[in-house]
């Protein structure tokens, strides 16, 4: 009994030392996936038991344990004797600090800012008083997926096979590819719209959906549509994701019917052929009108047909003959006209001179200057009306002597040629 009692007394005396006086709240180990460029808080809140409220100093250390085989520990932040110190990791000195202004107030958490892929490691928090407590956080920093490229391969006609291609040229592996039909007649492929691992809106959680897409064998980003038809029309969205983010691209599938396309092409070609024939016919009519405009009748000097029809003067200067079949009023030899003129105070001779000046023929020129000039005869005319036939032919310009002869030619039936 004496030996047993002594042993029991020894265990009672040593029990406070065997108990942990410093305790850190939370799990002993945490795994985190973080995106490049983000900020994170690595928690390390702790408690001190009454046995540890003595005068012993409080020491806090944060160290980085690399995943190398050596598992080298690098202390990068400390708190000792109410002083904060930075360790031997210069690339972390400007990006890490304690979350609390006084870490001795039961909070040894730190803020790590502007994360880099090289920050992937295991971070360990150690709080020492009379005893020591530790906590580890496994941090994996990844780059978000780059914006992918989407395209199709294959002819989009009814009954053919089409491959939808999707590829992201950036982002940390592993990358998962998920296709979803976002518009059209049906939705055979379910889409998951999410911005981060904490806001994944779907029937499945973010992690479950991520691993399920990997198991579906869509790692290469290809989706095969076999024997496409009108039901496959629509927009297809490719989502590239990893543990820290996602990116999307959209491609359109529009199935065409080969027979319908042939009909449309035939209709277009037929319309063009009809338009060409119509234009050719109009051009032929214009050429015929310009070339045979004189068939409707003879044209005068100014392009007007005298015997019927209007000549096309714009189509060319053609020689023409003018035939006037009209009866001119006769000039009777009675003295009634002379009496009227005497009554009006105009002698016959003066009237003849005034008319001669008014209706004098123009100077001799080309064929286009020929004109018919009515003139009152000074001599006596034969009684009774009689038809007058005048035939004017294009000729070379006459000289002035001929003009004088025409001026002095005797009149017949009251008209001067």
UniProtKB/Swiss-Prot annotation:
The chain crosses the membrane at residues 263-283. This is V-set and immunoglobulin domain-containing protein 8. The gene is Vsig8. Disulfide bonds join 44-125, 166-238. Residues 22-262 are extracellular. Residues 284-417 are cytoplasmic. Residues 1-21 form the signal peptide. Residues 22-140, 145-256 form the Ig-like V-type domain. One of its GO terms (cellular component) is membrane. Pfam families: Ig_3, V-set. The keyword Mitochondrion does not apply.
